[in-house]
């Protein structure tokens, strides 16, 4: 009997196959699962239904082991008897009975907790999203009106707390000590409620031994997960006589920038880094933050969250309503949750996980939209700083130091002077050594022939982090801007990351192992550090987690993940699965056009015959054969090449000829977005064609469903610029690595070719994957370049696209077949 996995609808066959693969991977102890499920196939719902079904089944299995083994369960965190009075000398039936009674009591306690959640839910407590940002909310903490005080009397706010450079710890002032004493006293007074909190928290931890961490790239994708999570109903893991209604304990995590409800911070600061430091500064101040409550307030917040499935906006509104900081309250609730959603950055940064107390041990980690995971890891662990940014930062530091040096303690003065000196070294190095983009440099080379031996990068970074000096300096510079020009203040207040934060990120890179990444010059006299071995950064996740599931709509070529993220994984500890699309086979045809000869190589792509004859005639014929109510979306390899084609067609009247058949819209690098106008024309059932750019604004994240795209065209192969600084460094790294491991020059040539092919085909898959969005959708894919016939290129296409490649390669035959296909669809619909 096939499992339904608690799917809210009748699942398609491919959805069942995907869910069976996920459930099987979790049951058999696989470490890695790489899954491709095309957009429009219900991937998110399949992921959560299969993983949560396994989670509940596993919990039931662990409880059964507890009962069968007299309270000893493998991989279970449920603590039964450790009472010395019940030793091994007692008869088994006595121990088993005693442990069983403890387990029963825990389950009854969980049932009481679920009833407690029922009580909260039945009070018709409503999260009002309109409360967000509404200062008229009567439930909010009342705040004093802040009168304007001349800047001269406010300068204390720009000073960091005294810093002890040897121990790298802040001095604890008397007021702080007093504050701690008060906190300790309050903790004693709240001991009863604290005990109750500990009971419910520990109970949830014990009965949820395995967690699911679901990470995705964007806020909208995480929001979609929450909406999908509301659809299925999962049975309780426990006997109904104990727990009849076991809710999903779902928790979305967000940043301070998303969740801060203190207007004194959010109205002043816009960058994530500045908001983080402003928050920490306020918490350390004598008055503290009125929303930063502990113990019972956070427990109440958690219980409200666990009454149902709430997205990040719900969490923010809940914090506003309860006068509780949503950021810290969600952090405190992590250990009690079953399912946690979080942005990529929280998952992929080990230091961030540590600071949030995110423990991945024995957990299931699901990374959605994982096609860009490698690039994201590289980006998170890379850094970049320009000569101009270094100079601007140095000027700011010097101004700040000149103003406050007499009021800074020795630790702050010494470290600020060291920072200024370090910036001076970097500025001098760039001025003396910059020659061209892509020029490799080493961290040691930067400090040669300097007195940098007195500079400890680790300690300077710690100083920036602990003293919050970046936030302090930025506050001061903003105040100067406000005093000098109120109009300029709005601009400075809303600027992006303060430069000292960017400098700190770059300084961290200087301490990275040489074999993991490279430093090199980029244009505009910039230095960039680029991570080249993402497997090292991903290793901690792989080591801790029970299973890591990477899922996406376009995961090919899958070999890229094994090569870059887990090269040492044992093959039998991994599983890969590429499911077909939900559409019938005849709803999508893929054509590779070889006649006429399309070849958009760098040397040939500007050939007048190719552009003005073959390419133009192709679009004329396609425009005629695709029904006028159906749109055409054509992708070009770059903005410059698309503009070249448009300019050529305009100069000889071809543009107007095509425009008379279909209204032309095209994407330009600095122009307005043509998508909305294109959609209006299609919705009015008029013929239109949209020319877009691979890697541009329209190639990812846009749904071209139904009539918006009855034909998608890929013009050429979108290879990256092989002369860019980043790609030169990556190419050199691949070559060095292969030769170091005993490979030949032929191996090097093959590997570098495959490297560029992979980048190209990932972009192709992302672009053509926009066309089909649901089971009744249909479209044709046209690949305009004879190189698509090469088996190494063809094999890197997504499986559902590759399997539908048609035998016809001649343009005339392809157009005849296309016409028949569209006529058939028109009749059937």
Curated annotation (Swiss-Prot):
This enzyme catalyses: Couples ATP hydrolysis with the unwinding of duplex DNA at the replication fork by translocating in the 5'-3' direction. This creates two antiparallel DNA single strands (ssDNA). The leading ssDNA polymer is the template for DNA polymerase III holoenzyme which synthesizes a continuous strand; ATP + H2O = ADP + phosphate + H(+)
Q: Which residues form the Helicase ATP-binding domain?
A: 1-433
User: Which InterPro entries does the record cross-reference, listed alphabetically?
Assistant: ATP-dep_Helicase_C, DinG/Rad3-like, DNA/RNA_helicase_DEAH_CS, Helic_SF1/SF2_ATP-bd_DinG/Rad3, Helicase-like_DEXD_c2, P-loop_NTPase, RAD3-like_helicase_DEAD, Rad3/Chl1-like
Query: Which residues bind [4Fe-4S] cluster per the record?
Result: 260, 279, 289, 325
Report the GO terms under cellular component: chromatin; nucleus
Its needed co-factors are: [4Fe-4S] cluster
Question: Which residue ranges does the UniProt annotation give for the motif DEAH box?
Answer: 368-371
Where ATP binds, per the record, is at 37-44
Its GO biological process annotations read:
establishment of sister chromatid cohesion; interstrand cross-link repair; mitotic G1 DNA damage checkpoint signaling; mitotic sister chromatid cohesion
Question: What Enzyme Commission number(s) apply to this enzyme?
Answer: 5.6.2.3
Report the cofactor remark.
Binds 1 [4Fe-4S] cluster.
Q: Which domain of life is it from?
A: Eukaryota
What UniProt keywords are attached to this protein's entry?
A: ATP-binding, Cell cycle, DNA-binding, Helicase, Hydrolase, Iron, Iron-sulfur, Isomerase, Metal-binding, Nucleotide-binding, Nucleus
User: What Gene3D superfamilies does this protein's entry cite?
Assistant: P-loop containing nucleotide triphosphate hydrolases
Q: Which PANTHER family match?
A: ATP-DEPENDENT DNA HELICASE DDX11-RELATED, DNA REPAIR DEAD HELICASE RAD3/XP-D SUBFAMILY MEMBER
Q: Could you tell me what this protein does?
A: ATP-dependent DNA helicase important for chromosome transmission and normal cell cycle progression in G(2)/M. May have a role in changing DNA topology to allow the loading of proteins involved in maintaining sister chromatid cohesion in the vicinity of the centromeres. Has a specific role in chromosome segregation during meiosis II.
Name listed for the protein in its UniProt record: ATP-dependent DNA helicase CHL1
Q: What species is this protein from?
A: Vanderwaltozyma polyspora (strain ATCC 22028 / DSM 70294 / BCRC 21397 / CBS 2163 / NBRC 10782 / NRRL Y-8283 / UCD 57-17) (Kluyveromyces polysporus)
| Encoding gene, per UniProt annotation | CHL1
């Amino acid at each position: 009997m096939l499992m339904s996995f608690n799917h809210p609808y009748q699942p398609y066959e491919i959805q069942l196959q995907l869910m069976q693969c996920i459930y099987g991977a979790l049951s058999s102890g696989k470490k890695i699962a790489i899954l491709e499920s095309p957009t429009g196939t219900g991937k998110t719902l399949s992921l959560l239904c299969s993983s949560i079904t396994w989670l509940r089944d596993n919990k039931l299995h662990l409880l059964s082991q507890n009962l069968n083994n007299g309270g000893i369960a493998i991989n279970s965190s449920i603590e039964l008897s450790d009472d010395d009075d019940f030793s091994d000398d007692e008869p088994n039936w006595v121990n088993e009975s005693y442990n069983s009674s403890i387990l029963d009591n825990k389950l009854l306690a969980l049932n009481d907790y679920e009833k407690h959640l029922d009580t909260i839910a039945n009070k018709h407590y409503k999260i009002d999203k309109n409360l967000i940002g509404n200062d008229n909310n009567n439930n909010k903490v009342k705040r004093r009106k802040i009168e304007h005080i001349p800047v001269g009397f406010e300068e204390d706010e720009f000073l960091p707390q005294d810093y002890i450079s040897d121990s790298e710890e802040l001095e604890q002032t008397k007021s702080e000590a007093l504050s701690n004493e008060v906190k300790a006293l309050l903790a004693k007074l709240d001991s009863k409620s604290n005990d109750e909190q500990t009971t419910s928290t520990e109970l949830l931890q014990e009965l949820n031994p395995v967690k699911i961490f679901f990470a995705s790239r964007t806020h909208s994708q995480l929001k979609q997960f929450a909406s999908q999570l509301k659809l299925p109903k999962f049975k309780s893991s426990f006997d109904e006589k104990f727990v009849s209604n076991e809710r999903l304990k779902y928790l979305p995590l967000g940043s301070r920038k998303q969740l801060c409800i203190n207007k004194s911070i959010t109205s002043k600061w816009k960058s994530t880094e500045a908001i983080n430091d402003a928050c920490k500064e306020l918490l350390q101040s004598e008055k503290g933050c009125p929303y930063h409550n502990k113990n019972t307030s956070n427990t109440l917040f958690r219980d409200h969250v666990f009454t149902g499935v709430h997205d990040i906006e719900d969490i923010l509104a809940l914090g506003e309503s309860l006068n509780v900081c949503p950021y810290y309250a969600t952090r405190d609730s992590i250990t009690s949750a079953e399912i946690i959603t979080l942005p990529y950055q929280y998952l992929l940064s080990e230091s961030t996980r540590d600071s949030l107390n995110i423990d991945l041990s024995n957990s299931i980690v699901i990374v959605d939209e994982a096609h860009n995971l490698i690039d994201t890891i590289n980006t998170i662990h890379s850094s970049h700083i320009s000569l101009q940014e270094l100079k601007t930062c140095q000027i700011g530091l010097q101004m700040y130091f000149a103003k406050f040096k007499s009021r800074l303690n020795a630790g702050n003065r010494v470290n600020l002077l060291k920072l200024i000196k370090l910036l001076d070294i970097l500025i001098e190095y760039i001025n003396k050594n910059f020659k061209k983009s892509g020029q490799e440099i080493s961290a040691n080379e930067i400090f040669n022939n300097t007195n940098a031996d007195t500079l400890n990068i680790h300690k300077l970074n710690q100083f920036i982090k602990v003293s919050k000096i970046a936030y302090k300096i930025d506050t001061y510079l903003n105040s100067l801007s406000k005093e000098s020009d109120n109009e300029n203040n709005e601009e400075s207040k809303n600027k992006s990351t303060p430069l000292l934060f960017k400098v700190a990120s770059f300084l961290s890179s200087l301490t990275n192992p040489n074999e993991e990444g490279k430093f090199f010059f980029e244009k505009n006299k910039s230095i960039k550090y680029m991570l080249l071995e993402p497997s090292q950064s991903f290793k901690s996740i792989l080591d801790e987690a029970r299973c890591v599931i990477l899922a996406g709509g376009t995961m090919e070529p899958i070999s890229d993940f094994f090569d870059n993220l887990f090269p040492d994984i044992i093959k039998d500890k991994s599983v890969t699965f590429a499911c077909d699309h939900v559409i019938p086979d005849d709803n999508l045809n893929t054509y590779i056009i070889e006649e006429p000869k399309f070849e958009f190589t760098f040397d040939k792509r500007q050939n007048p015959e190719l552009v003005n004859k073959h390419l133009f005639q192709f679009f004329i014929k396609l425009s005629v054969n695709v029904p006028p109510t159906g749109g055409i979306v054509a992708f070009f390899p770059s903005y410059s090449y698309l503009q070249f084609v448009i300019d050529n067609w305009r100069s000889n009247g071809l543009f107007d000829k095509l425009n008379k058949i279909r209204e032309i819209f095209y994407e330009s690098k600095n122009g307005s977005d043509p998508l909305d106008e294109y959609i209006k024309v299609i919705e009015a059932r008029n013929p239109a064609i949209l020319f877009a750019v691979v890697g541009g604004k329209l190639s990812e994240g846009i749904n071209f469903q139904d009539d918006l795209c009855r034909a998608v065209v890929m013009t050429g192969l979108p290879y990256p610029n092989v002369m860019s600084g980043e790609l030169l460094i990556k190419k050199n790294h691949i070559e060095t690595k292969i030769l170091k491991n005993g490979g030949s020059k032929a191996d090097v040539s093959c590997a570098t070719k495959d490297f560029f092919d992979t980048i190209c085909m990932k972009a192709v898959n992302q672009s053509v994957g926009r066309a089909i969005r649901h089971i009744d959708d249909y479209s044709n894919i046209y690949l305009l370049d004879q190189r698509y016939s090469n088996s190494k290129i063809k094999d890197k296409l997504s499986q559902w696209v590759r399997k539908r490649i048609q035998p016809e390669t001649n343009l005339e035959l392809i157009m005849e077949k296309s016409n028949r296909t569209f006529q058939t669809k028109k009749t059937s619909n």
